């Protein structure tokens, strides 16, 4: 049994040499769920006969969702095994959550009608009754939801935690982008564990966390736990209180509305999906934010001995913002092998490049030659355990030697013409033609690359260079 190495890092604080970039095949893309100049249209009073914009078109939603795509290979750790799976992770974290959700700078508290201190109508608002957020697959393949956070919590939940997810990465510990990629058996078949961590911070004040997720849908709500009776300045036997006729106080206690309910709220969440390595379809995910807001109305009514303060209902409305992202499970970033370019050391600027055929770089039989190094997917390869260099132009294309010693990409198989091994900086084909000759990858002139008998190969120095994966 081969030995595996446990290697744990944090993306928040990674100690590397200045200028060095750790090789971690994870692609991150921010998706912004954003809307500005939102109006908050609510009734003006408990008479419910007119409306106005309580936010003066100044409300906004700005939530930054970090979407990370990665491939994990199975590897052993002290905590168990990492999965062999294609993974996508949606995170709103403490590091870059966006500017948050905003209603107004200050709560409005005033009278909608006033006859006397003993007989009047009041209001307070607008404030958020709940903040709803979700991630869900809406079309295409439905992946399995492996984990979601946070869980159900009561109000005043204060917590800061770093949540990690371990993936197995093909290669060796400490590998760096633009440095040498795998060449020999132990490097090719080996893997290390990377702990992909994000920090979530919660300070929910008056809001409880209600996780309503099911199956592959992630659905969470931060719900205001105070009801209308709780928001009164005080309570007596029921949902009311009394005061002297000359009392000038408000029905509702403004101090019970924390700024998180109207000024700014920054949600955090983390949800992770897995797909089998055989999956090649697409999934359209919807990410959304719904801001539910409210204004509360109160009455002060005179009685024989005192005035009665009580709730007189509320007006509610909402604003919803959605975004979509398509995940292509057949994208080359989900391939298992370390991503490298095959760069010539006999030429200042030449990499092995899939030219394709008639403009189609993915077709079987597409030609392979040299080209200036640019690092696009048609120059990226992965050396698998069967000694094959798999092109990233498509999921089943391997570097192949033809009878005329030219190179193409063909459907991957067990043919010796698709097997390669390294001796120093020489990349040698296992292709045989009965002449007992070793054939080396070689520049035969200009940008033309073929395999050449060893004794004729004078531009045959190469290196596999690790590449940072990208969309």
Curated annotation (Swiss-Prot):
Any GO BP: cytolysis in another organism
Keyword Cell inner membrane: no
The keyword Signal belongs to this UniProt entry's keyword annotation: yes
Keyword field: Cytolysis, Hemolysis, Lectin, Signal, Toxin, Virulence
GO MF assignments: carbohydrate binding; toxin activity
Signal peptide extent: 1-20
Cellular component, GO, one term: extracellular region
Domain Ricin B-type lectin residue range list: 338-465
Alphabetical list of InterPro entries matching this protein: Leukocidin/Hemolysin_toxin (IPR016183), Leukocidin/porin_MspA_sf (IPR036435), Ricin_B-like_lectins (IPR035992), Ricin_B_lectin (IPR000772)
CDD domains, A to Z: beta-trefoil_Ricin_hemolysin
Function: Bacterial hemolysins are exotoxins that attack blood cell membranes and cause cell rupture by mechanisms not clearly defined.
Family: Belongs to the HlyA hemolysin family.
Name this polypeptide is given: Cytolysin
Organism for this UniProt entry: Vibrio vulnificus (strain CMCP6)
Lineage: Bacteria, Pseudomonadati, Pseudomonadota, Gammaproteobacteria, Vibrionales
